[in-house]
């Protein structure tokens, strides 16, 4: 999903697209990431160039549209733009590139089972694998022998209703254990009492209604690592 990210040498971090052949149907899959990663990961992107997903997708579509039957966008971008940056949301992408049959959005961490934007079917899922989109693309073969998309439907499935896939679980086991071990690694020790006082009202954290040492600590850490002058 980094077809619009280029190294300091001008080489793409990954191919912007791939073509999958399923049962004689050629599916072009285009992957991009929001250009706003330059805001959040600036230190890790020194010298790298992140281009606009709309421009990159347009170039790829013009290159492959005569070679594929279905065009799918897989984008780490929300529905709407962020920070007023054109092309950072898939709405701009669908409006500029109506050749997309389906766009799978992300980043917004919300469930959008089926939204039509400029004739493009757009879906998005919740974070942490809570939902999964099931998309059906219906095609019809024309007299010239070529496939043509006739309809698209989709729904978001709640993964809590399904048993984990044992094969995928086994493949991810080592990463899962590493993440769990990292999550419980001690990074410090608190002595002398709690950083937040006891709740005065049940179910209402005291930190939400008064200044606390906990919030002061969080803010100090944020300022330290961002060099903020507040």
Regions found by a protein language model. Give the residues of each.
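Acidic, metal/ion-coordinating pockets
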Residues: 1-161, 167, 209, 214-221
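Non-catalytic terminal accessory segments
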Residues: 65-66, 144, 159-230
């Amino acid at each position: 999903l980094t077809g619009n990210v280029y190294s300091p040498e001008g080489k793409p971090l990954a191919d912007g697209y791939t073509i999958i052949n399923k049962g004689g149907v050629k599916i072009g899959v285009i992957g991009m990431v929001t250009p706003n990663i330059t805001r959040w990961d600036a230190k890790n992107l020194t010298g790298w160039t992140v281009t606009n997903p709309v421009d990159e997708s347009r170039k790829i579509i013009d290159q492959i549209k005569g070679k594929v039957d279905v065009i799918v966008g897989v984008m780490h971008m929300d529905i709407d733009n962020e920070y007023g940056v054109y092309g950072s949301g898939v709405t701009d992408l669908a409006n500029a590139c109506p050749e997309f049959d389906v766009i799978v959005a992300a980043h917004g961490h919300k469930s959008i089972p089926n939204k039509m934007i400029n004739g493009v079917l757009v879906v998005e899922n919740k974070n942490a694998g809570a939902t999964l989109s099931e998309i059906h693309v219906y095609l019809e073969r024309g007299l010239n022998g070529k496939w043509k998309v006739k309809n698209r439907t989709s729904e978001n499935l709640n993964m809590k209703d399904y048993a984990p896939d044992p094969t995928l679980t086994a493949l991810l086991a080592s990463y899962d254990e590493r993440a769990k071990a990292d999550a419980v690694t001690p990074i410090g020790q608190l002595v002398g009492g709690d950083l937040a006082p006891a709740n005065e009202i049940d179910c209402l954290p005291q930190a939400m209604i008064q200044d606390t040492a906990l919030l002061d600590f969080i803010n100090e850490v944020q300022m330290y690592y961002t060099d903020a002058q507040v």
